[in-house]
Structures are given as structure tokens and as C-alpha cells.
């Protein structure tokens, strides 16, 4: 058991040694009056389609001379960031009033392109000294008219920057579009446009260390916190009711069972051969498709470990707002470093299940989650390339990811598998397994797999569904989510409810003399992932304004992968809890 512990300690040391580096990634530059402060234009895109973003100069803005692309980290590229030097000169404490930076005659095609962008509510994003700036590129004047052909389309041509500074550091920046300085795009004709900008500087007492707090305050407002705490209380009540109910029922039932089975020598044959003790010779019979089962446990354990490490980094403040690409970088690195845990767990359990083809099992473990994720990525990346969107990964980034998988993930997976194979641990079964399996008696329909999965998934989902909206609005929208402590509490509640409901359903399954509980407990535990995917359908059609083939395919494609990951992770939690329970109750009776 030292191997997985060693791997966990190693991963933790690497991550927390790098945590300080990630946090200091925000610019700590000091400037003198007149110094150049880096300003990068990032991307543009429809406001309601967060995945459908394009390079800033894909729209026919004035392109300055010597445009330079910023060298980006892996996480920034995965996040769809494509930073280039912006056309504005915002030197430190250098004020400007209606400075013209470009005069341009827009052709008919450029007018059409801008009008289409304005119609779709295109916004732009920039970074000034690593502080984000947003704004819409234009507006639609509907003037209480219902006929879209009568709408008027305007392009903003004057942007007003207001920058706050504290001594020699930039603290805050905001951009406001001048509503009176517009270019009419309604008709298909050439238009003269004079683009200009204004810069105002104001001093503030806000320290540099707190300049990012502005972006996390929205999620910490009292009315938002009330909803979050209502979610926590709702979840806690669910947990208390569930655990109390199950504990009462199971303890009472098990107590009666133990008393009955303790007197089995005096009881009649028809009384002693009933219930879950009747199948003690079959309950530890290994499941079918043992290689797939072990691989699922290995992948689920890895994803559970990955989630814990992500929460640890979030709670120490690594994922502060607009730390570009930090989450994606952490996901890639931690997944690669924890692959040894998947290999060890899968191979050791597979050998306990008396499996012989451990190499094939290891290959299955490596592909079980990465395979569907890779196929989904290939399809969605092709869609993004077709749209020329920034979500399309460059060839170099794909090569880097393949190298990480080849040089880090795969070797660690193999090393973990070898360690698991050589652990020589035997499966601890309190009862001997008979040579031939008993026939399972006919069961009512509600004891079959699908109704049981529906019952098992509903309760854990009900404990997290309120928090899901805020997570979705952050991942697939423009909300900022920073209350990671509450999210971690919800995650712990999710794990507890999943474990308890799986244990209860496993007991009722065994009491009905159905000994095929291995896969059933895994499926019941993981069924919450199916409920989350069903919530995706509801969120897309009822709570969001997403549209278009690209955004739709990205949303449902990547959410399918995330829900599949939840299925594997929670399935592992459910099975582990059920295994502990089954071992406990059969260890408490005398098995022949």
C-alpha cells in the first residue's frame, strides 16, 4: 500500500511547490510616468456563445504596424486565448482625450461583417497589465420595432478607458463605449470610420494585492451567498434525513438478521435459508468482465484524486479570477501525474480478481477515459477549425499534449500497473465462494438495474442541483465563481450521499437474494452523472441563450465527457462503500 501513498505525496509536493509560482503569475510590474504598460487584445465573439470566439483582428479593425503575438502557456491556449498587441497606447499616467488612432473606409464586405457581429452581440476582451477589459463592439437600435428589417445597426468608434493607479502600480481599468460616437452599419455601402479613444487616470488607495477582489465580489454578494447557503442547508438536511433513515432501518434490520442467524442451529431449515445469509457462498463471486471492472475502478480512483487536488489548489487561492489558463494547466498536469494511481489500482484489483491479462487491463485503463475524451476532442477541434475559432488548438499544442501523454502519463500508468501487479494482495472475502452460482429468484421490476440507478442518482443530484446552476453559468457563461469552500462542502455531501444510498440499495439487493451486486453498486453510484447530463439539456434549453452548431456541439460534447468522468468517479465511490458494507455484514456472521 506504500506505492499509491508515495505517488500522492509526490504529486502534492510538486503541486504545492508550484502553487506560489502560479499565484505570482499576475503582473507585479512597477511603472514610471510615461512607461509602456502591456495591453493585449484577446478575442471577440457572440456574448451568449462563450466557446465560439475568434481572434480580435478577424474583424476588420485597424491593424497597427508591428502586431506581436504574446507567447502563451499551455493553459491559455487550451482556454482559447490568443493575445496580440492592441492598437491603443495606454502609457502609465498618460491621459489622452479623443485620440484618433485610425481613419478607415469600411468596404461593403467589412460593413456586412461588422453588422453581422453587432447583430450577434459580439463582445471584445483585452488584458491591460493582466487586468481584463470587456466591451461590446456595437449596438442594435430596435426603437420598439418588431420587424428585424427595420432595425438599425451601429458600430462603436470611441472607447473611453478609466484607469486607477496606486503610486507606481495599475490597480483597475474599465472601458466604456461612447453611445454618441457611432458608425451606421444599416446599409450595404462604404462608410468612413474614425476610431478614437480617451484615457483618464485616477489615484486610489486600493493596494496592489487586492486589485483582483473586484472580480470575485459579485459571487460573494449577500443575496448570492444566501442562495449558496440555502443550497448547503438543503444538502445537509438531505444527508441527515438519508443517513438517519438508513442508519435506523439498516441497524434495526441487521440486528434482527444477526439475532436470527445466531440462532440458525435451532431454527428450522426454511427459516435459516432466507435473506442475505442464504447467498453467502455467492456474494463474493467475482463479477463478469473483470478487466473492464478493474479499469473502471482505476480510472474512477484517478479522477477522484484529481478532483481532490483541484479543490486543494482552489482553496489555497491558485484559481483566482482571470488567472488565465491556470485551471486547464492544473487539469493536464495533475491528470498526467496521477495516472500511476489508476495503473496501480486497476492492476492490483484485477490481479485480486484472478485476472491473467494484466497488460491488456492496463491498456484498457489508459484508454477508458482518455479514449472517449480524445475522440470528442478530435470532432470538436475539427468543428472549431471549420469555424476558424480560437477554440481550435494549434498543431504545436496538440503535439505537446501527445508528448505529455506519451512521456509522462503512459510511463506512470505502466509503473503503477507493475507495482499493482507485484503487490500480491489477495481479495479479502469473509466467506468461501461455492463452485456453482445459485439461481437468482424472480424479482419485481423496481429491483432491476435501471429503476435502482434512477433511485440512486436522484438523491445525490438533489443535493447538488442548486450549485450546478452557478457552476454552469461560470463554465458556460460569464459569471465568476470563487466560493470554492462552499463547492467543496457540496462535493463532500455528494460523496456521502452517494456512498449511503449505494449501501442501502446493495443491502436490499442482497436481502432479495440477488448476489450480482458488484456492477450494480458501481452503476448505482455513478448514475448521478446521468442526472447531471439530463440537467445539461434543461440548462441549455431553459436557462441559457446558447445557439449555433459549434456552441451546441461544444456544450454537449464536453459535458458528456465531464459527466462520464463523474460516472466513473462516483461509481468507484459507490462500489467501495458497498464493498466495505458487504464485508462487514458477512464478517459478523458465521459462514460455513
From Swiss-Prot:
GO cellular component, one term: Golgi membrane
Keyword Membrane tagged: yes
Coiled coil: none
One Pfam family named in its UniProt record: EMP70
Residue intervals annotated with topology Cytoplasmic: 251-302, 346-362, 419-452, 507-521, 575-592
Motif Endoplasmic reticulum export signal per record, residues: 581-586
InterPro entries in UniProt: EMP70, MFS_trans_sf
Residue ranges crossing the lipid bilayer per the database entry: 230-250, 303-323, 325-345, 363-383, 398-418, 453-473, 486-506, 522-542, 554-574
Domain of life: Eukaryota
Keyword Hydrolase: no
Sequence motif: Golgi retention signal, positions: 590-592
Signal peptide: 1-24
Principal location: membrane
Topology with respect to the bilayer: Multi-pass membrane protein
Domain notes: The C-terminal KXD/E motif functions as a Golgi retention signal, certainly through the binding to the COP1 coatomer.
PANTHER family the record matches: TRANSMEMBRANE 9 SUPERFAMILY MEMBER 2, TRANSMEMBRANE 9 SUPERFAMILY PROTEIN
Family (UniProt): Belongs to the nonaspanin (TM9SF) (TC 9.A.2) family.
The name this protein goes by in its record: Transmembrane 9 superfamily member 2
Protein species of origin: Arabidopsis thaliana
Lineage of source species: Eukaryota, Viridiplantae, Streptophyta, Embryophyta, Tracheophyta
Gene (UniProt): TMN2
Amino acid at each position: 500500500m506504500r506505492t499509491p501513498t508515495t505517488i500522492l505525496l509526490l504529486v502534492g509536493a510538486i503541486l504545492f511547490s508550484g502553487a506560489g509560482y502560479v499565484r505570482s503569475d499576475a503582473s507585479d510590474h512597477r511603472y514610471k510616468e510615461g512607461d509602456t504598460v502591456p495591453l493585449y487584445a484577446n478575442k471577440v465573439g457572440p456574448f451568449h456563445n462563450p466557446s465560439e470566439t475568434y481572434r480580435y483582428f478577424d474583424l476588420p479593425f485597424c491593424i497597427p504596424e508591428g502586431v506581436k503575438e504574446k507567447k502563451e502557456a499551455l493553459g491559455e491556449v487550451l482556454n482559447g486565448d490568443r493575445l496580440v498587441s492592441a492598437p491603443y497606447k495606454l502609457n502609465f499616467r498618460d491621459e489622452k482625450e479623443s485620440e484618433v488612432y485610425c481613419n478607415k473606409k469600411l468596404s461593403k464586405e467589412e460593413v456586412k461583417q461588422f453588422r453581422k457581429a453587432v447583430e450577434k452581440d459580439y463582445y471584445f476582451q483585452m488584458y491591460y497589465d493582466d487586468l481584463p477589459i470587456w466591451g461590446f463592439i456595437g449596438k442594435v437600435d430596435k426603437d420598439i420595432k418588431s420587424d428585424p428589417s427595420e432595425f438599425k445597426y451601429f458600430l462603436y468608434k470611441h472607447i473611453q478607458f478609466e484607469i486607477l493607479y496606486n503610486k507606481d502600480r495599475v490597480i483597475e481599468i474599465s472601458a466604456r463605449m461612447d453611445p454618441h460616437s457611432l458608425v451606421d452599419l444599416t446599409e450595404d455601402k462604404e462608410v468612413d470610420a474614425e476610431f478614437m479613444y480617451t484615457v483618464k487616470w485616477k489615484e486610489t488607495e486600493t493596494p496592489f494585492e487586492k486589485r483582483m477582489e473586484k472580480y470575485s465580489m459579485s459571487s460573494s454578494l449577500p443575496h448570492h451567498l444566501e442562495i449558496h447557503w440555502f443550497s448547503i442547508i438543503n444538502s445537509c438536511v438531505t444527508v441527515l434525513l438519508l443517513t438517519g433513515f438508513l442508519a435506523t432501518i439498516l441497524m434495526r434490520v441487521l440486528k434482527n438478521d444477526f439475532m436470527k442467524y445466531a440462532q440458525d442451529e435451532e431454527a428450522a431449515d426454511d427459516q435459516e435459508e432466507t435473506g442475505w445469509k442464504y447467498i453467502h457462498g455467492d456474494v463474493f463471486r467475482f463479477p463478469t468482465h473483470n478487466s473492464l471492472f478493474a479499469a473502471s475502478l482505476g480510472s474512477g480512483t484517478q479522477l477522484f484524486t484529481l478532483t481532490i487536488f483541484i479543490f486543494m489548489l482552489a482553496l489555497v487561492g491558485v484559481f483566482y479570477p482571470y488567472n488565465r489558463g491556470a485551471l486547464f494547466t492544473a487539469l493536464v498536469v495533475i491528470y498526467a501525474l496521477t495516472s500511476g494511481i489508476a495503473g496501480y489500482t486497476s492492476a492490483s484489483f484485477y490481479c485480486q480478481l484472478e485476472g491473467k491479462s494484466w497488460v491488456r487491463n492496463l491498456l484498457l485503463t489508459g484508454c477508458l477515459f482518455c479514449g472517449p475524451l480524445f475522440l470528442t476532442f478530435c470532432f470538436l477541434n475539427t468543428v472549431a477549425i471549420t469555424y476558424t475559432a480560437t477554440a481550435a488548438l494549434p498543431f504545436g499544442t496538440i503535439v505537446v499534449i501527445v508528448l505529455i501523454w506519451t512521456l509522462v502519463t503512459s510511463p506512470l500508468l505502466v509503473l503503477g500497473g507493475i507495482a499493482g501487479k507485484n503487490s500480491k494482495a489477495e481479495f479479502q472475502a469473509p466467506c468461501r465462494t461455492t463452485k456453482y452460482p445459485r439461481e437468482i429468484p424472480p424479482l419485481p421490476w423496481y429491483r432491476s438495474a435501471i429503476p435502482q440507478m434512477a433511485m440512486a442518482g436522484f438523491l445525490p443530484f438533489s443535493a447538488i442541483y442548486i450549485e450546478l446552476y452557478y457552476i454552469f453559468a461560470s463554465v458556460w457563461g460569464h459569471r465568476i465563481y470563487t466560493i470554492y469552500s462552499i463547492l467543496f462542502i457540496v462535493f463532500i455531501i455528494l460523496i456521502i450521499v452517494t456512498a449511503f444510498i449505494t449501501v442501502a440499495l446493495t443491502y436490499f439487493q442482497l436481502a432479495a437474494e440477488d448476489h450480482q451486486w458488484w456492477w450494480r453498486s458501481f452503476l448505482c453510484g455513478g448514475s448521478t452523472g446521468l442526472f447531471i447530463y439530463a440537467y445539461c439539456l434543461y440548462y441549455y434549453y431553459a436557462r441559457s441563450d446558447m445557439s449555433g452548431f459549434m456552441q451546441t456541439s461544444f456544450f454537449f460534447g464536453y459535458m458528456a465527457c465531464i459527466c462520464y468522468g463523474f460516472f466513473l468517479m462516483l461509481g468507484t465511490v459507490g462500489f467501495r462503500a458497498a464493498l466495505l458494507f458487504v464485508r462487514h455484514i458477512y464478517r459478523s456472521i458465521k459462514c460455513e
